């Protein structure tokens, strides 16, 4: 008897599974709020060199700035430089206000970086880490690097949580992730220096990686084949809710410390909710924990209204399933490359996940230059994800996972490519293409999560998810730094995001299709297929169920 047959007895989709999805909704909402938080935490408002002694009369401000600040080629006052000596401006009324007339210098006046710090426009943000620690001009790289540090932490956490949850269980490691994220988030909000903030945010990313690695498999491993797609897409809408909620919370809370607290404190009720979250019965059986699996399966049958008693779900039957699925030795990342088909799957998934994350976060963190303020842009980027979910739901059921993933990545690449052809004056077209690209990239992200969870066997599912998430977060950590390439050529970041998305689209076509296939439970289930193109062709040992 395979686990799918046990699941058929107790109900593969019902109140038990819906309750499980609801309990695991909170981490799906919190993830985008933390991952996209740099949009607000690192925002750089308009700024200029601090000029002590500026006239109180606002009507003379322009003349005062003209005397002290150079202009950029576009005519704006410089944000990073001031004249070494104030210029003498003829016909100015500043002299009559008791201000020094400055010096009349021959040639081009010399400039210096702001020696007395900066003054910031606080009309949009009362405080960000950029204004708190002057992470502008020569220090702007440190401001961008905070996102890289965070995703580097997620990268490390993906490895750790993927491996440890396969060894010690999904539920236990989810508790570790919740507690760690809560404590580290609170410490981050209390940071007294940039160094302290960078370290604690990196560690917070490590903790939050547990959410990304554990939640989706913990949902899917309780679902039958026929409902995996709808449940996967449904649960991914919680991510979209988090994206839109972040726009609202960011609009209401303009101080970075309080904003960080607002997105961290919900971890507390999440910890309490774990009391009702069931451990994966699939995983329990692979570990030989028959009694625990029996208890959860009976609970599932009771909530789903299935008349399964002790005789209908005997411990002897479970012991046979456990004996067939028990892991002889602990899984390791080497196992993902030990056999031909798993090696093929792992290498392709690594490329795909790098491209998905690199393009998604490159698009998501670029909220400037669209003719909208940061809150409107964030809300619009969140709203477009809803129709993206519908696109995924319809496409994966008819076209399959592989073509859907490749198509959405191609759409992301084309949207970025067309933006390169649109001039900066065409704000409406630029906004439309940015929103379209964001929608395609979100659809690719949703499909990648569902697809990857179905490709790996139960005994290595968390390990495989951890590896691909590791490489994906590497892409996410490089995306903010790629934005610095605009100093070389303004269009270079978009070209990089689009090019990598195109490479990922081509690689996705090399993956096996999982539409209509039951979840593989052992490495042998994966390797038994000799054809590299599909998990649903001949010699499939697992029962096929119409999606």
Curated annotation (Swiss-Prot):
Reaction(s) catalysed by this chain's protein: orotate(out) + L-glutamate(in) = orotate(in) + L-glutamate(out); 3',5'-cyclic GMP(in) = 3',5'-cyclic GMP(out); GMP(in) = GMP(out); 2'-deoxyguanosine(in) = 2'-deoxyguanosine(out)
Keyword Cytoplasm in record: no
Listed GO CC annotations: apical plasma membrane; basal plasma membrane; basolateral plasma membrane; plasma membrane
Signal peptide residues on this chain, from the entry's feature table: none
Region named Disordered: 521-547
Broad class of the protein's primary localization: membrane
A matching Pfam family: MFS_1
Topology in the lipid bilayer: Multi-pass membrane protein
Single Gene Ontology BP annotation: prostaglandin transport
Keyword line: Cell membrane, Ion transport, Membrane, Transmembrane, Transmembrane helix, Transport
One GO MF term: organic anion transmembrane transporter activity
Residue intervals passing through the bilayer: 21-41, 145-165, 173-193, 203-223, 233-253, 258-278, 345-365, 374-396, 403-423, 431-451, 465-485, 492-512
Top-level taxon of the source organism: Eukaryota
Keyword Transferase: no
Subcellular localization(s) per the UniProt record: Basolateral cell membrane; Apical cell membrane; Cell membrane
Family per similarity comment: Belongs to the major facilitator (TC 2.A.1) superfamily. Organic cation transporter (TC 2.A.1.19) family.
Function recorded in the entry: Functions as a Na(+)-independent bidirectional multispecific transporter. Contributes to the renal and hepatic elimination of endogenous organic compounds from the systemic circulation into the urine and bile, respectively. Capable of transporting a wide range of purine and pyrimidine nucleobases, nucleosides and nucleotides, with cGMP, 2'deoxyguanosine and GMP being the preferred substrates.
Protein known as: Solute carrier family 22 member 7
Encoding gene, per UniProt annotation: SLC22A7
